[in-house]
């Protein structure tokens, strides 16, 4: 891994000084365990199958080339099938082989012949790449769940291609202000209600209606700001006016789409209509900086800029490098999520928090989407996500597939 600056790669990243294999060997030599590199008490002195690399038949006996967990590739060994007690890995090996052959056939290329004695090198190479990909995605999934501060779990899935975790994305739970921008997360007033649902509360002080009904569903029209109770309020965590601040409550899956839209997000549980799903967070930058970055992003065909234009257009949220699950939510011209502006501890109207609520019931397994041209008013904006004048030079084709598709993201 090439050495890079800490600021460029994130404060928690440092250059790799030795290879993973060397590090594993050093751990074993010193009798040290390190879960993050696969060295555990279970396999420190014993062998555990990590994945299967290859297959052959010798004298009517089936053998698999085994990669041992926590051991370098140089220690891989051929083992007879009868010695392997890993049915799930054997099934995965078979599935990967089948998927590779199906992809080759779909591409109208010549299917490598399998004589049932040995695997063609291309098949074995693909199987190893898939195994390494699963390990990388599992580690990424574990990291995401360590960093999140909300109830809902995050899962990662890729059954489409060999794409691994993004190399330049860092999970955050709240806005990250760029140098020179200050976020004051301390409210200037708070309520003293005993029952915020029935009494005059924070929304009334701000001149708007309470956003939620008794079922914690949003009841105000798009374009109306949400004012939740804050840290100065005397109400407790069960207050009916504390919804967005509790974070995502649903288990979500970042998955690889099969139609060329990259990563997407789907819900693993049913979501009721008008329910809070997630926040859109990222790096808060000036609109001038957004203009500069927008030109670069357009040339790469990516779309992560969200203008904070509730009352002014001074700031933009850039989720390209820093963000949460919303970073992976795809666009749709007929979305199932709606944008709302939210104010909690920071009451600066130039810097609303961006919350995504369901517009209808969303079933388990369904992809989550929002309209990249939609702003908090509920209308199509000419200066909302990735659509400022400097970003109009390159138009990105829309692949949402909706009947009402406009053809372009910007």
UniProtKB/Swiss-Prot annotation:
Although the SET domain contains the active site of enzymatic activity, both pre-SET and post-SET domains are required for methyltransferase activity. The SET domain also participates in stable binding to heterochromatin. In the pre-SET domain, Cys residues bind 3 zinc ions that are arranged in a triangular cluster; some of these Cys residues contribute to the binding of two zinc ions within the cluster. Interacts with SMAD5. The large PER complex involved in the histone methylation is composed of at least PER2, CBX3, TRIM28, SUV39H1 and/or SUV39H2; CBX3 mediates the formation of the complex. Zn(2+) 1 binds at residues 191, 193, 196, 201. GO terms for molecular function: histone H3 methyltransferase activity; histone H3K9 methyltransferase activity; histone H3K9 trimethyltransferase activity; S-adenosyl-L-methionine binding; transcription cis-regulatory region binding; ubiquitin-like ligase-substrate adaptor activity; zinc ion binding. Changing residue 383 to H: In a breast cancer sample; somatic mutation. Histone methyltransferase that specifically trimethylates 'Lys-9' of histone H3 using monomethylated H3 'Lys-9' as substrate. H3 'Lys-9' trimethylation represents a specific tag for epigenetic transcriptional repression by recruiting HP1 (CBX1, CBX3 and/or CBX5) proteins to methylated histones. Mainly functions in heterochromatin regions, thereby playing a central role in the establishment of constitutive heterochromatin at pericentric and telomere regions. H3 'Lys-9' trimethylation is also required to direct DNA methylation at pericentric repeats. It comes from Homo sapiens. The gene is SUV39H2. This is Histone-lysine N-methyltransferase SUV39H2. Zn(2+) 4 binds at residues 333, 398, 400, 405. Its EC number is 2.1.1.355. Zn(2+) 2 binds at residues 191, 202, 229, 233. GO terms for cellular component: chromatin; chromosome, centromeric region; nucleoplasm; nucleus. Ubiquitinated by the DCX(DCAF13) E3 ubiquitin ligase complex, leading to its degradation. Its main location: nucleus. GO terms for biological process: cell differentiation; cellular response to hypoxia; chromatin organization; chromatin remodeling; circadian rhythm; epigenetic programming in the zygotic pronuclei; methylation; negative regulation of DNA-templated transcription. Residues 189-247 form the Pre-SET domain.
């Amino acid at each position: 891994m090439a050495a890079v600056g800490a600021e460029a790669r994130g404060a928690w990243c440092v250059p790799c000084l030795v290879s993973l294999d060397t590090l594993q060997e050093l751990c074993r030599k010193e009798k040290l365990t390190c879960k993050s590199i696969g060295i555990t008490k279970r396999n420190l002195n014993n062998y555990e199958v990590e994945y299967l690399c290859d297959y052959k038949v010798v004298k009517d006996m089936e053998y698999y080339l085994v990669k041992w967990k926590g051991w370098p590739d140089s220690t891989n060994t051929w083992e007879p099938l009868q010695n392997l007690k890993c049915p799930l890995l054997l099934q995965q090996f078979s599935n990967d082989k089948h998927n590779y052959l199906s992809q080759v056939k779909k591409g109208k290329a010549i299917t490598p012949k399998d004589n049932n004695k040995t695997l063609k090198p291309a098949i074995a190479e693909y199987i190893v790449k898939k195994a390494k990909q699963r390990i990388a995605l599992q580690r990424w999934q574990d990291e995401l769940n360590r960093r999140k501060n909300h109830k809902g779990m995050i899962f990662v899935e890729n059954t489409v291609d060999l794409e691994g975790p993004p190399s330049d994305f860092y999970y955050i739970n709240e806005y990250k202000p760029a140098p020179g921008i200050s976020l004051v997360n301390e409210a200037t007033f708070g309520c003293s209600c005993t029952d915020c649902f029935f009494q005059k509360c924070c929304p009334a002080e701000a001149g708007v209606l309470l956003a939620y009904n008794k079922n914690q569903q949003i009841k105000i029209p798009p374009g109306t700001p949400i004012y939740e109770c804050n840290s100065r309020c005397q109400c407790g965590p069960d207050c009916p006016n504390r919804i967005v601040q509790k974070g995502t409550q649903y288990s979500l899956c970042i998955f690889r789409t099969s139609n060329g839209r990259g990563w997407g997000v789907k819900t693993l549980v049913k979501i009721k209509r008008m329910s809070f799903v997630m926040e859109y967070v990222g790096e808060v930058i000036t609109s001038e900086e957004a203009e500069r970055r927008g030109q670069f992003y357009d040339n790469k065909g990516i779309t992560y800029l969200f203008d904070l234009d509730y009352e002014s257009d001074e700031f933009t949220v850039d989720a390209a490098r820093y963000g949460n699950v919303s970073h992976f939510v795809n666009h749709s011209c007929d979305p199932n999520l709606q944008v709302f502006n939210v104010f909690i501890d920071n009451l600066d109207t130039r810097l609303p928090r961006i919350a995504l609520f369901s517009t209808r019931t969303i079933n388990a397994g369904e992809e989550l989407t929002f309209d990249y041209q939609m702003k908090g008013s509920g209308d199509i904006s000419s200066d909302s996500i990735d659509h400022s004048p400097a970003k109009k030079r390159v138009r990105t084709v829309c692949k949402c597939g909706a009947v009402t598709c406009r053809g372009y993201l910007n």
